[in-house]
Amino acid sequence: MRKKALIFTVIFGIIFLAVLLVSASIYKSAMAQKEEGHEAAAAEAKKETDLAHVDQVETFVGKEKYYVVKGTDKKGTALYVWVPADKKAKILSKEAKEGISEDKAAKIIKDEGLVSKQKEVHLAREGNVLLWEVTYLDKEGQYSLSYVDFTTGKILKNITP
């Protein structure tokens, strides 16, 4: 009886270890894809704009894929640079003070009475329109998002799947 329990424990341990290793491999692969292109986008942003120091790079995928590079110029002015994955599209750059802040975008959506619980706020872009993408749970608990114009603060689109 002890021998069967030992065999069962060893087999279970091997299966558990295999599942753990496969899961770790999948996670590592997914995270690598998430950050793929970030270094090239940061280099391109530095080359094509006044950006001197990169603080953060995020990927935005809407109608097109963009990398949003946040950083500062040589004077310490906060800059946002939208680098398209498609090299034919134009790189756009704005000083942070030229648009509304992340907090202001979130407040605009909250003031509309749409938000039950705010999730995230990220810079986004649709064509040449610069946006804040605000994700949240609405009053019915559905995961929703709204696009707020970076420059004007106007809500351009609300999406609830």
Curated annotation (Swiss-Prot):
<dbReference type="GO" id="GO:0008360">
    <property type="term" value="P:regulation of cell shape"/>
</dbReference>
<dbReference type="InterPro" id="IPR041401">
    <property type="entry name" value="TseB-like_dom"/>
</dbReference>
<keyword id="KW-0472">Membrane</keyword>
<comment type="function">
    <text>Required for normal cell shape. Plays an important role in cell wall elongation during exponential phase and spore outgrowth. Probably regulates the activity of the penicillin-binding protein PBP2A through a direct interaction. Not required for PBP2A activity, stability and localization.</text>
</comment>
<keyword id="KW-0133">Cell shape</keyword>
<dbReference type="InterPro" id="IPR025711">
    <property type="entry name" value="PepSY"/>
</dbReference>
<keyword id="KW-0812">Transmembrane</keyword>
<feature type="transmembrane region" description="Helical">
    <location>
        <begin position="6"/>
        <end position="26"/>
    </location>
</feature>
<dbReference type="Pfam" id="PF17881">
    <property type="entry name" value="TseB"/>
</dbReference>
<comment type="subunit">
    <text>Interacts with the penicillin-binding protein PBP2A, a monofunctional transpeptidase.</text>
</comment>
<feature type="topological domain" description="Extracellular">
    <location>
        <begin position="27"/>
        <end position="161"/>
    </location>
</feature>
<dbReference type="InterPro" id="IPR054944">
    <property type="entry name" value="regulator_TseB"/>
</dbReference>
<protein>
    <recommendedName>
        <fullName>Probable cell wall elongation regulator TseB</fullName>
    </recommendedName>
</protein>
<dbReference type="Pfam" id="PF03413">
    <property type="entry name" value="PepSY"/>
</dbReference>
<keyword id="KW-1003">Cell membrane</keyword>
<dbReference type="GO" id="GO:0005886">
    <property type="term" value="C:plasma membrane"/>
</dbReference>
<dbReference type="InterPro" id="IPR046350">
    <property type="entry name" value="Cystatin_sf"/>
</dbReference>
<keyword id="KW-1133">Transmembrane helix</keyword>
<feature type="topological domain" description="Cytoplasmic">
    <location>
        <begin position="1"/>
        <end position="5"/>
    </location>
</feature>
